[in-house]
């Protein structure tokens, strides 16, 4: 008996849309679209000038009644900031149109811009380097001006640094917006005469990623690109303080070479090197190989003098003048635990540790003559017969001094010699601390 399959019932268009085949096919098309929208931008290179045209896409500047507050009502702008500078007609007044602004240290900014400037942001706030310094011209000498700065995002994208390509790539959309803030220069208001004579430096501006910051620092998102802007506002005489900016005249200046990426740690090693070489406050990060010959000699001489001054055994005051030439000075600055004739004190202690008294007058006289510069400034008739430890700065007891003057030859004070071997193993500082005591009973280190 043969079984025949019954014909499948025909489904309506609505029912067919919810079938397994239709759902799977629609899921594949959605996956393809999402891959095209998310994966491809990650592989696109970010051109150095690609961020500048987006500056024209900034929304119109919104008015803000409170000058000191950090934010305002949302304007629905796609960017992560809400500009706080009030809106005025596009064409500035004749007086404000005459004002021009130039960026100081432009050459340094250009060097960083070629590599892709990065600025560190921290919870406590970090200052910018290079610092934004500007100078104004065309201002009225008798008028008063307020200089401000804010930092706005370049676009609504988030970036990541590709180390294998040494370039920045788009990593997706920007993070949620942070409170926008204006930084008023602390010396404001300036007179026009002051602005003509001096430059305005925003060296105290600090960048932070702390959303709850209460110190007035500019809050930024990490791995986002930003553009600093400088604003100059003409202050009217009848206004005591800037509480309402609706009636104030202002002008904004943007320098494209100051665009930077906010980071919590430097991504590009070339940026790190350039900042170390250019920042005068980063001298601690430089090694001696980057110094000039003159600087290196001065640094080495300072280190040499410092180590010599800290030496526990050195010549007495006034004896340095009698040393004479460089050979004597170099010998006096040498290690106090190395004698002449290639005889080290450690080997000398080892060879004489088995005797209760010193029985080698020839070696002792050689040591005495070589270390004469390390003794007291006044010559002594029994200089060559004194025990070696007296010439190293150890005070002698009367009994030891008397025994050294006997015809039988010099002897050591009444302590056991092998114990001092432990002192010299501890280094010069620990050794002198043990030798400095005037007691004849010496105990070894535990």
From Swiss-Prot:
Gene3D superfamilies assigned: Transcription factor, T-box
Encoding gene (name): tbx20
Domain of life: Eukaryota
SUPFAM superfamilies for the chain: p53-like transcription factors
PROSITE patterns found in the cross-reference section: TBOX_1, TBOX_2, TBOX_3
Region Disordered, annotated ranges: 50-80
Gene Ontology cellular component annotations, sorted alphabetically: chromatin; nucleus
KW Nucleus (keyword) present: yes
Location of the protein in the cell: Nucleus
DNA-binding positions: 108-287
Species for this entry: Danio rerio (Zebrafish)
Molecular functions per Gene Ontology: DNA-binding transcription factor activity, RNA polymerase II-specific; RNA polymerase II cis-regulatory region sequence-specific DNA binding
Alphabetized UniProt keyword annotations: Developmental protein, DNA-binding, Nucleus, Transcription, Transcription regulation
Name of the protein: T-box transcription factor TBX20
Function comment: Transcriptional regulator that may play a very early role in the differentiation of the cardiac precursors.
InterPro entries, per the entry: p53-like_TF_DNA-bd_sf, T-box_DNA-bd, T-box_sf, TF_T-box, TF_T-box_CS
GO terms classed as biological process: angiogenesis; blood vessel development; cardiac muscle cell proliferation; cell fate specification; cloaca development; embryonic heart tube development; embryonic hemopoiesis; heart development
């Amino acid at each position: 008996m043969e079984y025949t399959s019954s014909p499948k019932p025909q489904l309506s268009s609505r029912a067919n849309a919810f079938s397994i085949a239709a759902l799977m096919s629609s899921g594949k098309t959605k996956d393809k679209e999402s891959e095209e929208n998310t994966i491809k931008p990650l592989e696109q290179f970010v051109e150095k000038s690609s961020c500048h045209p987006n500056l024209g896409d900034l929304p119109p500047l919104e008015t803000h009644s409170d000058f000191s507050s950090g934010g305002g009502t949302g304007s629905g702008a796609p960017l992560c900031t809400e500009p706080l500078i009030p809106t005025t007609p596009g064409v500035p007044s004749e007086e404000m149109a005459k004002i021009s602004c130039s960026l100081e240290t432009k050459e340094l900014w250009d060097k960083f811009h070629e590599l892709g400037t990065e600025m560190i942001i921290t919870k406590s706030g970090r200052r910018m380097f290079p610092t934004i310094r500007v100078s104004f011209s065309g201002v009225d000498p008798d008028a008063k001006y307020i200089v401000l700065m804010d930092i706005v995002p370049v676009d609504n994208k988030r970036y990541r640094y590709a180390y294998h390509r040494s370039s920045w790539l788009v990593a997706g959309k920007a993070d949620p917006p942070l409170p926008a803030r204006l930084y008023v220069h602390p010396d404001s208001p300036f007179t026009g005469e002051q602005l003509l004579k001096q430059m305005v430096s925003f060296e105290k501006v600090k960048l932070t990623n702390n959303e709850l910051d209460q110190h007035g620092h500019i809050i930024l998102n990490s791995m986002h690109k930003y553009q600093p802007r400088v604003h100059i506002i003409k202050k009217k005489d009848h206004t005591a303080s800037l509480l309402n900016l609706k009636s104030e005249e202002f002008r904004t200046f943007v320098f494209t070479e100051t665009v930077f990426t906010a980071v919590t740690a430097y991504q590009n090693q070339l940026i790190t090197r350039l900042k170390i070489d250019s920042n005068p406050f980063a001298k601690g990060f430089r090694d001696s190989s980057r110094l000039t010959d003159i600087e290196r000699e001065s640094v080495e001489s300072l280190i040499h003098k410092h180590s010599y001054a800290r030496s526990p055994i050195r010549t007495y005051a006034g004896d340095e003048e009698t040393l004479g030439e460089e050979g004597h000075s170099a010998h006096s600055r040498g290690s106090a635990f190395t004698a002449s004739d290639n005889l080290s004190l450690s080997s000398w202690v080892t060879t004489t540790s088995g005797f209760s008294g010193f029985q080698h007058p020839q070696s002792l006289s050689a040591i005495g003559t070589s270390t004469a510069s390390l003794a007291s400034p006044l010559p002594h008739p029994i200089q060559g017969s004194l025990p070696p430890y007296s010439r190293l700065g150890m005070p002698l007891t009367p009994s030891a001094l008397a025994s050294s003057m006997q015809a039988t030859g010099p002897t050591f004070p009444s302590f056991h010699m092998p114990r001092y071997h432990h002192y010299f193993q501890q280094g010069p500082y620990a050794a002198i601390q043990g030798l400095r005591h005037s007691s004849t009973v010496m105990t070894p280190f535990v």
